[in-house]
């Protein structure tokens, strides 16, 4: 009973972080299964495994997106790494609102159940993650499936907003003595910016899907031209949330990568303040570019010109981050342990994803590329190889601190190489498919596209083998087998202590700090003084 009480009613940031990780892993496996089903259907032209049920194909696409975004990346990045390490990194005893933290987590399992049950009601919700009306309207999806999906989004949104409030309060008010804002570790900064993005964007999504709910059930016409509404209004509202959302997914990853590159290059991050302001700029600009998802809906030409220019400007702070990571590695004595491999892979692949993003930012080109596989390739390069690689990198970097045991290095490196090969083989051919005009969200295609699709599907099977390696690593590390106990500082940062988590035992005590640590000087400040 005590164990049940410990995990059900926990107010400890580490326990809640662990719950988020377990939840994210379960949702991630489910989302991966859906993606493999999608790739099996697309492996050859014609109907393969779904027997011509094209609505079911769209339900799979929708579920895959929701699971990966709202139930895997966000819980693991913000809920998992955020809860586990933000309090430790700032020298705080716990989060500001521990019980709010608990309810933030426990809103997610019911939300997941609602999403999964929506697939079982009538024909499921085959709207794509954007849930555009009129397809999501009562005439096109007459059952309760879309309503259940909307309620699922509401719950997960409430969870995220409560979590954001908690992080903002914690970071502003609970820093240890001497831990000024300009001394905050970059991961903490990234979580802070992310929390503000969530707080400002999620209420807009909530408004949009609530209006959709009343359109479906109470005969309002917010998005129905017959009653003076406009479906384009929904798109504006959705993307005003949806674009900051993609930065919410990647920003904590930026923070994690900064820590890893610094640790394994044996030097402080190049241009710390520049990194901080770059993240803040990305956060602000993220709210000013939403309509680049809507270049094909008939926006005015000067509107399109503005959104093209604004979107390209986002590349500037992103470029500052990329070059600062490279400058951090420049001249460092680099150790290519598994976390560093994932970090370097992240930088390389995220840059490719960013380049295709610059291509899509051109409103003229986007007319041709919108809703083709080029877009799918673009956002999977920044998510499937950006956010997910950052998750893996963070896992290998901090796993000793979490479990108190070292991971098997060779298996970790095998996991990296299989996954790296698999995801590139899956998503690189999609650029060619998109340039040839293959449309997204369609379960069949002309024979001309068969070659690249076969290759892409083969790549996704390889990725699954890589992810199985990962769970082998987790199993070995978490069991008390041969792997040795983890030192306080497994990456030998004693000579170069950069952040507080390497000064506490592994795993940290239930209450991390007996007394709050006082910060005298950071490594970066020391460097500058020299």
Curated annotation (Swiss-Prot):
The keyword Disulfide bond is assigned to this record: no
Domain of life of the native organism: Eukaryota
Catalytic activity as recorded in UniProt: 4 Fe(II)-[cytochrome c] + O2 + 8 H(+)(in) = 4 Fe(III)-[cytochrome c] + 2 H2O + 4 H(+)(out)
InterPro entries, per the entry: Cyt_c_oxase-like_su1_dom, Cyt_c_oxase-like_su1_sf, Cyt_C_Oxase_1, Cyt_c_Oxase_su1_BS, Cyt_c_oxase_su1_dom, Cyt_c_oxidase_su1_bac
Keyword Calcium: yes
This enzyme's EC code(s): 7.1.1.9
Record keywords, A-Z: Calcium, Copper, Electron transport, Heme, Iron, Magnesium, Membrane, Metal-binding, Mitochondrion, Mitochondrion inner membrane, Respiratory chain, Translocase, Transmembrane, Transmembrane helix, Transport
Major subcellular site: mitochondrion
GO CC terms in record: mitochondrial inner membrane; respiratory chain complex IV
Residues annotated for O2 binding in this entry: 247
Annotated Cu cation binding sites: 243, 292-293
GO molecular function per UniProt: cytochrome-c oxidase activity; heme binding; metal ion binding
Binding site for Fe(II)-heme a: 64, 380
Residues involved in Ca(2+) binding: 41, 46, 443
Gene3D superfamilies on file: Cytochrome c oxidase-like, subunit I domain
Binding site residues for Mg(2+): 370-371
Cross-link (1'-histidyl-3'-tyrosine (His-Tyr)), chain numbering: 243-247
Residues reported in the UniProt entry to bind heme a3: 378
Localisation: Mitochondrion inner membrane
Transmembrane domains' residue ranges: 18-38, 66-86, 103-123, 148-168, 186-206, 237-257, 269-289, 312-332, 340-360, 379-399, 414-434, 447-467
Enzyme class: translocase
Subunit-structure text: Component of the cytochrome c oxidase (complex IV, CIV), a multisubunit enzyme composed of a catalytic core of 3 subunits and several supernumerary subunits. The complex exists as a monomer or a dimer and forms supercomplexes (SCs) in the inner mitochondrial membrane with ubiquinol-cytochrome c oxidoreductase (cytochrome b-c1 complex, complex III, CIII).
Function as written in the Swiss-Prot or TrEMBL entry: Component of the cytochrome c oxidase, the last enzyme in the mitochondrial electron transport chain which drives oxidative phosphorylation. The respiratory chain contains 3 multisubunit complexes succinate dehydrogenase (complex II, CII), ubiquinol-cytochrome c oxidoreductase (cytochrome b-c1 complex, complex III, CIII) and cytochrome c oxidase (complex IV, CIV), that cooperate to transfer electrons derived from NADH and succinate to molecular oxygen, creating an electrochemical gradient over the inner membrane that drives transmembrane transport and the ATP synthase.
PANTHER family found in the cross-reference section: CYTOCHROME C OXIDASE SUBUNIT 1 (PTHR10422:SF18)
Family: Belongs to the heme-copper respiratory oxidase family.
Protein name in the entry: Cytochrome c oxidase subunit 1
Organism whose genome encodes this protein: Sorghum bicolor (Sorghum)
Gene: COX1
């Amino acid at each position: 009973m005590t164990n049940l009480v410990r995990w059900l009613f926990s107010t400890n940031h580490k326990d809640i972080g662990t719950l988020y990780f377990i939840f994210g892993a379960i949702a991630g496996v489910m989302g991966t299964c859906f993606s493999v089903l999608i790739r099996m259907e697309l492996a050859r032209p014609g109907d393969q495994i779904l027997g011509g049920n094209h609505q079911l194909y769209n339900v799979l696409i929708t579920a895959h997106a929701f699971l990966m975004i709202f139930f895997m990346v966000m819980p693991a990045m913000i809920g998992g790494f955020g809860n586990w390490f933000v309090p430790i990194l700032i020298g705080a005893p716990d989060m500001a609102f521990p019980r709010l933290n608990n309810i933030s987590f426990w809103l997610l399992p019911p939300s997941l159940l609602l999403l999964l049950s929506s697939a079982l009601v009538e024909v499921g919700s085959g709207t794509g993650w954007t849930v555009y009306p009129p397809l999501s309207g009562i005439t096109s999806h007459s059952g309760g499936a879309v309503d259940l999906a909307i309620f699922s989004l509401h719950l997960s949104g409430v969870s995220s907003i409560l979590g954001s409030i908690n992080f903002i309060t914690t970071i502003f008010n609970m820093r240890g003595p001497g831990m000024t804002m300009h001394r905050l570790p970059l991961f903490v900064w990234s979580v802070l910016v992310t929390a503000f993005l969530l707080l400002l964007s999620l209420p807009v999504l909530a408004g949009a899907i609530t209006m959709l709910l009343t359109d479906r059930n109470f005969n309002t016409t917010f998005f129905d031209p017959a009653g003076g509404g406009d479906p384009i209004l929904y798109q504006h509202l959705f993307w005003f949330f949806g674009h900051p959302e993609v930065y919410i997914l990647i920003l904590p990853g930026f923070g994690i990568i900064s820590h890893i590159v610094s640790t394994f290059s044996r030097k402080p991050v190049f241009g710390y303040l520049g990194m901080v302001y770059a993240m803040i700029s990305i956060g602000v600009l993220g709210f000013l570019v939403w309509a680049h998802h809507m270049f094909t809906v008939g926006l005015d030409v000067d509107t399109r010109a503005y959104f093209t220019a604004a979107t390209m400007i986002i590349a500037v702070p992103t470029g500052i981050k990329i070059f600062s990571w490279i400058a951090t590695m420049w001249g460092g004595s680099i150790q290519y342990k598994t976390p560093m491999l994932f970090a370097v892979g992240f930088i390389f692949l995220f840059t490719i994803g960013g380049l295709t993003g610059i291509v899509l930012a051109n409103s003229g080109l986007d007319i041709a590329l919108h809703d083709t596989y080029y877009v799918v390739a673009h956002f999977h390069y920044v998510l499937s190889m950006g956010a997910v690689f950052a998750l893996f990198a963070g896992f290998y970097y901090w796993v000793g601190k979490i479990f108190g045991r070292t991971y098997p290095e060779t298996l970790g490196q095998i996991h990296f190489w299989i996954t790296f090969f698999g995801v590139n083989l899956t998503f690189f051919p999609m650029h060619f498919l998109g340039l040839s005009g293959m449309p997204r969200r369609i379960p069949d295609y002309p024979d001309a596209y068969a070659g690249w699709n076969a290759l892409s599907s083969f790549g996704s099977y390889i990725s699954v083998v890589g992810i199985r390696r990962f769970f082998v690593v987790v199993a070995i590390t978490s069991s008390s087998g041969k792997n040795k106990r983890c030192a306080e500082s497994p990456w030998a940062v004693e000579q170069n202590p950069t952040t507080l988590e390497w000064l506490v035992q592994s795993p940290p005590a239930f209450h991390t700090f007996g007394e709050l640590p006082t910060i005298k000087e950071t490594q970066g400040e020391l460097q500058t003084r020299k």
